[in-house]
Protein backbone atom coordinates (compact mmCIF):
# COMPACT_ATOMS: atom_id res chain seq x y z
CA UNK A 1 0.00 0.00 0.00
CA UNK A 2 2.82 2.39 0.93
CA UNK A 3 4.62 1.60 -2.35
CA UNK A 4 1.45 2.40 -4.34
CA UNK A 5 1.02 5.77 -2.58
CA UNK A 6 4.68 6.63 -3.18
CA UNK A 7 4.35 5.72 -6.88
CA UNK A 8 1.24 7.93 -7.22
CA UNK A 9 3.14 10.83 -5.59
CA UNK A 10 6.02 10.38 -8.05
CA UNK A 11 3.60 10.37 -11.02
CA UNK A 12 1.85 13.51 -9.68
CA UNK A 13 5.21 15.27 -9.16
CA UNK A 14 6.34 14.30 -12.66
CA UNK A 15 3.18 15.63 -14.30
CA UNK A 16 3.26 18.69 -12.00
CA UNK A 17 6.80 19.52 -13.14
CA UNK A 18 5.82 19.05 -16.79
CA UNK A 19 2.75 21.30 -16.39
CA UNK A 20 4.81 23.99 -14.68
CA UNK A 21 7.41 23.83 -17.48
CA UNK A 22 4.61 24.06 -20.08
CA UNK A 23 3.15 27.08 -18.24
CA UNK A 24 6.56 28.80 -18.06
CA UNK A 25 7.04 28.24 -21.81
CA UNK A 26 3.57 29.64 -22.52
CA UNK A 27 4.27 32.73 -20.38
CA UNK A 28 7.57 33.32 -22.20
CA UNK A 29 5.82 33.10 -25.59
CA UNK A 30 3.07 35.49 -24.45
CA UNK A 31 5.64 38.02 -23.19
CA UNK A 32 7.55 37.68 -26.46
CA UNK A 33 4.42 38.31 -28.56
CA UNK A 34 2.59 40.87 -26.42
CA UNK A 35 5.28 42.42 -24.21
CA UNK A 36 6.36 42.06 -20.59
CA UNK A 37 3.50 42.20 -18.11
CA UNK A 38 0.83 40.94 -20.54
CA UNK A 39 0.23 38.06 -18.09
CA UNK A 40 1.46 38.04 -14.51
CA UNK A 41 0.71 36.43 -11.19
CA UNK A 42 -1.35 38.75 -9.03
CA UNK A 43 1.17 38.55 -6.18
CA UNK A 44 3.98 39.69 -8.49
CA UNK A 45 2.40 43.07 -9.27
CA UNK A 46 4.61 45.91 -8.15
CA UNK A 47 1.68 48.17 -7.29
CA UNK A 48 -1.18 46.43 -5.53
CA UNK A 49 -2.79 49.62 -4.25
CA UNK A 50 -5.02 51.59 -6.62
CA UNK A 51 -3.52 54.97 -7.54
CA UNK A 52 -5.89 57.86 -6.95
CA UNK A 53 -6.19 61.57 -7.63
CA UNK A 54 -8.02 63.78 -5.16
CA UNK A 55 -11.47 64.91 -6.29
CA UNK A 56 -10.75 68.41 -5.00
CA UNK A 57 -13.24 67.91 -2.15
CA UNK A 58 -12.24 66.44 1.22
CA UNK A 59 -15.74 65.12 1.94
CA UNK A 60 -15.92 63.40 -1.45
CA UNK A 61 -12.42 61.91 -1.05
CA UNK A 62 -13.57 60.37 2.25
CA UNK A 63 -16.82 59.06 0.71
CA UNK A 64 -14.88 57.51 -2.19
CA UNK A 65 -12.90 55.51 0.38
CA UNK A 66 -9.64 55.38 -1.56
CA UNK A 67 -8.96 59.11 -1.16
CA UNK A 68 -10.07 60.27 -4.60
CA UNK A 69 -10.85 59.11 -8.13
CA UNK A 70 -9.02 55.91 -9.13
CA UNK A 71 -6.59 56.39 -12.01
CA UNK A 72 -7.15 54.38 -15.16
CA UNK A 73 -10.88 54.06 -14.47
CA UNK A 74 -14.18 55.43 -15.79
CA UNK A 75 -16.27 57.69 -13.54
CA UNK A 76 -19.92 58.63 -14.13
CA UNK A 77 -21.44 61.71 -12.47
CA UNK A 78 -25.20 62.08 -12.88
CA UNK A 79 -28.09 63.93 -11.30
CA UNK A 80 -30.96 66.39 -11.92
CA UNK A 81 -30.49 69.70 -13.70
CA UNK A 82 -28.48 72.37 -11.84
CA UNK A 83 -27.48 69.90 -9.12
CA UNK A 84 -23.73 70.62 -9.38
CA UNK A 85 -22.49 67.83 -11.69
CA UNK A 86 -20.28 70.07 -13.82
CA UNK A 87 -19.01 71.84 -10.69
CA UNK A 88 -17.86 68.51 -9.22
CA UNK A 89 -16.12 67.65 -12.52
CA UNK A 90 -14.43 71.07 -12.78
CA UNK A 91 -12.99 70.64 -9.28
CA UNK A 92 -11.39 67.43 -10.55
CA UNK A 93 -9.96 69.37 -13.52
CA UNK A 94 -8.52 72.01 -11.18
CA UNK A 95 -7.01 69.28 -8.98
CA UNK A 96 -5.42 67.50 -11.96
CA UNK A 97 -3.80 70.77 -13.06
CA UNK A 98 -2.72 71.53 -9.49
CA UNK A 99 -0.85 68.20 -9.43
CA UNK A 100 0.94 69.12 -12.67
CA UNK A 101 -1.26 67.08 -14.99
CA UNK A 102 -3.03 67.91 -18.25
CA UNK A 103 -6.84 67.94 -18.42
CA UNK A 104 -9.22 67.94 -21.38
CA UNK A 105 -12.88 68.96 -21.46
CA UNK A 106 -15.20 67.62 -24.19
CA UNK A 107 -18.03 70.17 -24.09
CA UNK A 108 -20.79 68.39 -26.01
CA UNK A 109 -23.41 70.67 -24.44
CA UNK A 110 -21.54 73.80 -25.66
CA UNK A 111 -22.25 75.37 -22.28
CA UNK A 112 -18.91 75.65 -20.45
CA UNK A 113 -18.48 79.01 -18.69
CA UNK A 114 -14.74 79.89 -18.71
CA UNK A 115 -15.17 82.55 -16.01
CA UNK A 116 -16.86 80.08 -13.65
CA UNK A 117 -14.23 77.42 -14.39
CA UNK A 118 -11.48 79.94 -13.57
CA UNK A 119 -13.25 80.84 -10.30
CA UNK A 120 -13.09 77.15 -9.32
CA UNK A 121 -9.32 77.13 -9.81
CA UNK A 122 -9.12 75.83 -13.38
CA UNK A 123 -6.25 77.21 -15.45
CA UNK A 124 -8.28 77.93 -18.59
CA UNK A 125 -5.14 78.81 -20.56
CA UNK A 126 -3.89 75.22 -20.14
CA UNK A 127 -7.25 73.43 -20.37
CA UNK A 128 -7.79 71.46 -23.60
CA UNK A 129 -11.32 72.19 -24.85
CA UNK A 130 -13.33 70.55 -27.62
CA UNK A 131 -16.89 71.33 -28.70
CA UNK A 132 -17.68 68.47 -31.10
CA UNK A 133 -20.33 68.53 -33.81
CA UNK A 134 -21.51 64.96 -33.13
CA UNK A 135 -21.28 62.22 -30.54
CA UNK A 136 -18.93 60.12 -32.66
CA UNK A 137 -16.58 63.07 -33.13
CA UNK A 138 -16.52 63.83 -29.40
CA UNK A 139 -15.78 60.22 -28.44
CA UNK A 140 -13.14 59.92 -31.19
CA UNK A 141 -11.38 63.05 -29.89
CA UNK A 142 -11.53 61.69 -26.33
CA UNK A 143 -10.09 58.39 -27.56
CA UNK A 144 -7.15 60.04 -29.35
CA UNK A 145 -6.33 62.15 -26.28
CA UNK A 146 -6.43 59.07 -24.04
CA UNK A 147 -4.33 56.99 -26.46
CA UNK A 148 -1.63 59.68 -26.44
CA UNK A 149 -0.90 58.88 -22.79
CA UNK A 150 -0.17 62.57 -22.17
CA UNK A 151 -3.56 63.52 -20.70
CA UNK A 152 -4.31 62.79 -17.03
CA UNK A 153 -8.03 63.62 -17.02
CA UNK A 154 -10.74 63.73 -19.69
CA UNK A 155 -14.22 65.09 -18.89
CA UNK A 156 -17.17 64.51 -21.24
CA UNK A 157 -20.09 66.89 -20.60
CA UNK A 158 -22.48 65.25 -21.18
CA UNK A 159 -23.40 61.77 -22.42
CA UNK A 160 -26.96 62.92 -23.16
CA UNK A 161 -25.56 65.61 -25.50
CA UNK A 162 -23.48 63.09 -27.51
CA UNK A 163 -25.89 62.99 -30.44
CA UNK A 164 -25.18 60.32 -33.11
CA UNK A 165 -24.34 61.70 -36.55
CA UNK A 166 -27.28 59.86 -38.15
CA UNK A 167 -29.69 61.67 -35.83
CA UNK A 168 -28.13 65.05 -36.65
CA UNK A 169 -28.37 64.40 -40.40
CA UNK A 170 -31.99 63.21 -40.10
CA UNK A 171 -35.15 65.22 -39.54
CA UNK A 172 -36.72 66.09 -36.20
CA UNK A 173 -39.30 63.40 -35.48
CA UNK A 174 -37.37 60.57 -37.16
CA UNK A 175 -37.15 57.41 -35.10
CA UNK A 176 -33.58 56.47 -34.10
CA UNK A 177 -34.07 53.63 -31.63
CA UNK A 178 -30.93 52.56 -29.76
CA UNK A 179 -28.48 54.65 -31.83
CA UNK A 180 -26.93 56.43 -28.85
CA UNK A 181 -26.80 53.25 -26.76
CA UNK A 182 -24.95 51.39 -29.55
CA UNK A 183 -22.54 54.31 -29.98
CA UNK A 184 -21.76 54.38 -26.23
CA UNK A 185 -21.41 50.59 -26.06
CA UNK A 186 -18.85 50.61 -28.88
CA UNK A 187 -17.01 53.56 -27.33
CA UNK A 188 -16.75 51.84 -23.94
CA UNK A 189 -15.35 48.69 -25.54
CA UNK A 190 -12.70 50.73 -27.37
CA UNK A 191 -11.80 53.17 -24.60
CA UNK A 192 -11.74 51.00 -21.46
CA UNK A 193 -8.47 49.18 -22.21
CA UNK A 194 -6.71 52.39 -23.30
CA UNK A 195 -7.94 54.26 -20.20
CA UNK A 196 -6.53 51.55 -17.94
CA UNK A 197 -3.23 51.32 -19.82
CA UNK A 198 -2.54 55.07 -19.79
CA UNK A 199 -3.90 55.58 -16.22
CA UNK A 200 -6.18 58.34 -17.49
CA UNK A 201 -9.24 59.27 -15.45
CA UNK A 202 -12.31 59.53 -17.71
CA UNK A 203 -15.27 61.39 -16.20
CA UNK A 204 -18.61 61.16 -18.01
CA UNK A 205 -21.30 63.60 -16.86
CA UNK A 206 -24.84 62.36 -17.45
CA UNK A 207 -28.38 63.65 -17.14
CA UNK A 208 -31.54 62.02 -15.81
CA UNK A 209 -34.61 60.83 -17.69
CA UNK A 210 -37.94 59.37 -16.54
CA UNK A 211 -39.09 55.91 -17.58
CA UNK A 212 -42.65 56.00 -18.91
CA UNK A 213 -45.26 53.84 -17.18
CA UNK A 214 -43.22 52.82 -14.13
CA UNK A 215 -45.62 52.20 -11.24
CA UNK A 216 -43.17 50.74 -8.70
CA UNK A 217 -39.52 51.41 -8.05
CA UNK A 218 -37.38 54.31 -9.21
CA UNK A 219 -38.53 55.71 -12.59
CA UNK A 220 -35.26 57.62 -13.09
CA UNK A 221 -32.70 56.43 -15.61
CA UNK A 222 -29.66 57.83 -17.43
CA UNK A 223 -29.37 58.16 -21.24
CA UNK A 224 -26.84 56.25 -23.32
CA UNK A 225 -27.82 52.68 -22.53
CA UNK A 226 -26.33 50.38 -19.93
CA UNK A 227 -22.73 50.14 -21.17
CA UNK A 228 -21.48 53.15 -19.18
CA UNK A 229 -23.10 51.80 -16.00
CA UNK A 230 -21.21 48.52 -16.40
CA UNK A 231 -17.82 49.99 -17.37
CA UNK A 232 -17.82 52.75 -14.71
CA UNK A 233 -15.76 51.93 -11.61
CA UNK A 234 -17.40 54.80 -9.71
CA UNK A 235 -20.88 56.31 -10.14
CA UNK A 236 -21.83 59.49 -8.28
CA UNK A 237 -25.39 60.71 -7.76
CA UNK A 238 -25.35 64.49 -7.19
CA UNK A 239 -28.44 66.12 -5.65
CA UNK A 240 -28.97 69.65 -4.37
CA UNK A 241 -30.93 69.79 -1.11
CA UNK A 242 -31.52 73.13 0.66
CA UNK A 243 -30.61 76.69 -0.21
CA UNK A 244 -27.94 78.51 1.81
CA UNK A 245 -28.99 82.01 2.84
CA UNK A 246 -26.54 84.86 3.16
CA UNK A 247 -25.85 87.04 6.18
CA UNK A 248 -26.15 90.78 6.72
CA UNK A 249 -27.25 92.55 3.54
CA UNK A 250 -27.62 89.17 1.79
CA UNK A 251 -29.80 87.53 4.46
CA UNK A 252 -32.75 87.31 2.05
CA UNK A 253 -30.64 86.06 -0.86
CA UNK A 254 -29.52 82.54 -1.68
CA UNK A 255 -25.71 82.34 -1.89
CA UNK A 256 -25.39 78.60 -2.43
CA UNK A 257 -26.95 75.21 -1.81
CA UNK A 258 -26.23 72.19 0.31
CA UNK A 259 -25.52 69.21 -1.92
CA UNK A 260 -25.37 65.47 -1.31
CA UNK A 261 -23.06 63.33 -3.43
CA UNK A 262 -23.88 59.63 -3.07
CA UNK A 263 -21.41 56.99 -4.24
CA UNK A 264 -23.91 54.53 -5.76
CA UNK A 265 -21.22 52.29 -7.28
CA UNK A 266 -17.62 51.81 -6.21
CA UNK A 267 -15.27 49.06 -7.39
CA UNK A 268 -12.29 50.20 -5.31
CA UNK A 269 -13.91 50.76 -1.88
CA UNK A 270 -17.25 50.14 -0.10
CA UNK A 271 -20.08 51.99 -1.91
CA UNK A 272 -23.19 53.92 -0.76
CA UNK A 273 -21.30 56.51 1.27
CA UNK A 274 -22.55 60.10 1.10
CA UNK A 275 -20.56 63.33 0.95
CA UNK A 276 -22.36 66.47 2.11
CA UNK A 277 -20.87 69.65 0.64
CA UNK A 278 -21.80 73.30 0.23
CA UNK A 279 -21.72 74.56 -3.35
CA UNK A 280 -21.45 78.34 -3.24
CA UNK A 281 -22.54 80.29 -6.31
CA UNK A 282 -19.54 81.64 -8.20
CA UNK A 283 -17.13 79.76 -5.94
CA UNK A 284 -17.93 76.04 -6.20
CA UNK A 285 -17.52 73.57 -3.35
CA UNK A 286 -16.66 75.37 -0.12
CA UNK A 287 -13.47 73.55 0.88
CA UNK A 288 -13.13 75.57 4.08
CA UNK A 289 -16.75 74.85 5.00
CA UNK A 290 -16.43 71.08 4.60
CA UNK A 291 -13.10 71.06 6.47
CA UNK A 292 -14.58 72.93 9.45
CA UNK A 293 -17.57 70.55 9.60
CA UNK A 294 -15.52 67.33 9.36
CA UNK A 295 -12.71 68.55 11.66
CA UNK A 296 -15.29 69.67 14.25
CA UNK A 297 -16.93 66.22 14.19
CA UNK A 298 -13.48 64.67 14.81
CA UNK A 299 -12.72 67.25 17.56
CA UNK A 300 -9.65 68.42 15.66
CA UNK A 301 -11.33 71.83 15.63
CA UNK A 302 -13.09 72.56 18.92
CA UNK A 303 -16.45 74.31 19.01
CA UNK A 304 -17.73 76.14 22.09
CA UNK A 305 -20.99 77.95 21.48
CA UNK A 306 -20.52 79.96 18.29
CA UNK A 307 -16.71 80.04 18.60
CA UNK A 308 -14.35 77.74 16.71
CA UNK A 309 -10.81 77.14 17.98
CA UNK A 310 -7.78 75.09 16.97
CA UNK A 311 -4.97 74.15 19.38
CA UNK A 312 -6.44 76.53 21.95
CA UNK A 313 -6.46 79.50 19.55
CA UNK A 314 -9.78 80.98 18.43
CA UNK A 315 -10.19 81.06 14.66
CA UNK A 316 -13.60 82.69 14.36
CA UNK A 317 -17.05 83.33 15.78
CA UNK A 318 -19.54 81.57 13.56
CA UNK A 319 -18.78 79.30 10.63
CA UNK A 320 -18.50 82.14 8.09
CA UNK A 321 -15.78 83.90 10.10
CA UNK A 322 -13.97 80.59 10.66
CA UNK A 323 -14.12 79.92 6.89
CA UNK A 324 -12.59 83.32 6.15
CA UNK A 325 -9.83 82.72 8.71
CA UNK A 326 -8.84 79.40 7.12
CA UNK A 327 -9.01 80.95 3.65
CA UNK A 328 -6.61 83.68 4.80
CA UNK A 329 -4.26 81.13 6.45
CA UNK A 330 -3.65 78.39 3.85
CA UNK A 331 -0.82 76.79 5.89
CA UNK A 332 -3.28 76.22 8.77
CA UNK A 333 -5.86 74.86 6.31
CA UNK A 334 -3.31 72.35 4.96
CA UNK A 335 -2.30 71.29 8.49
CA UNK A 336 -5.89 70.56 9.56
CA UNK A 337 -6.68 68.91 6.21
CA UNK A 338 -3.68 66.59 6.65
CA UNK A 339 -4.80 65.60 10.16
CA UNK A 340 -8.31 64.77 8.90
CA UNK A 341 -6.97 62.64 6.04
CA UNK A 342 -4.65 60.77 8.42
CA UNK A 343 -7.62 60.15 10.75
CA UNK A 344 -9.60 58.54 7.90
CA UNK A 345 -6.60 56.53 6.70
CA UNK A 346 -6.26 58.41 3.41
CA UNK A 347 -2.68 59.46 4.26
CA UNK A 348 0.06 58.04 6.45
CA UNK A 349 0.98 59.92 9.60
CA UNK A 350 4.41 61.33 8.73
CA UNK A 351 5.34 61.74 12.41
CA UNK A 352 4.45 58.11 13.21
CA UNK A 353 6.28 56.91 10.08
CA UNK A 354 9.37 58.89 11.05
CA UNK A 355 9.22 57.49 14.60
CA UNK A 356 8.87 53.94 13.25
CA UNK A 357 11.86 54.48 10.95
CA UNK A 358 13.92 55.75 13.90
CA UNK A 359 13.00 52.72 16.03
CA UNK A 360 13.87 50.36 13.15
CA UNK A 361 17.23 52.10 12.64
CA UNK A 362 18.08 51.82 16.34
CA UNK A 363 17.11 48.13 16.32
CA UNK A 364 19.45 47.54 13.36
CA UNK A 365 22.28 49.31 15.23
CA UNK A 366 21.73 47.11 18.31
CA UNK A 367 21.79 43.95 16.16
CA UNK A 368 25.09 45.04 14.59
CA UNK A 369 26.58 45.83 18.02
CA UNK A 370 25.54 42.38 19.31
CA UNK A 371 27.06 40.71 16.25
CA UNK A 372 30.33 42.60 16.83
CA UNK A 373 30.34 41.61 20.52
CA UNK A 374 29.79 37.93 19.66
CA UNK A 375 32.63 38.02 17.11
CA UNK A 376 35.00 39.56 19.71
CA UNK A 377 34.13 36.84 22.26
CA UNK A 378 34.73 34.13 19.66
UniProtKB/Swiss-Prot annotation:
SMART domains: AAA (SM00382). Keywords: ATP-binding, Cytoplasm, DNA damage, DNA recombination, DNA repair, DNA-binding, Nucleotide-binding, SOS response. GO terms for molecular function: ATP binding; ATP hydrolysis activity; ATP-dependent DNA damage sensor activity; damaged DNA binding; single-stranded DNA binding. It is found in: Cytoplasm. NCBIfam families: tigrfam_recA. Belongs to the RecA family. This is Protein RecA. It comes from Streptococcus equi subsp. equi (strain 4047).
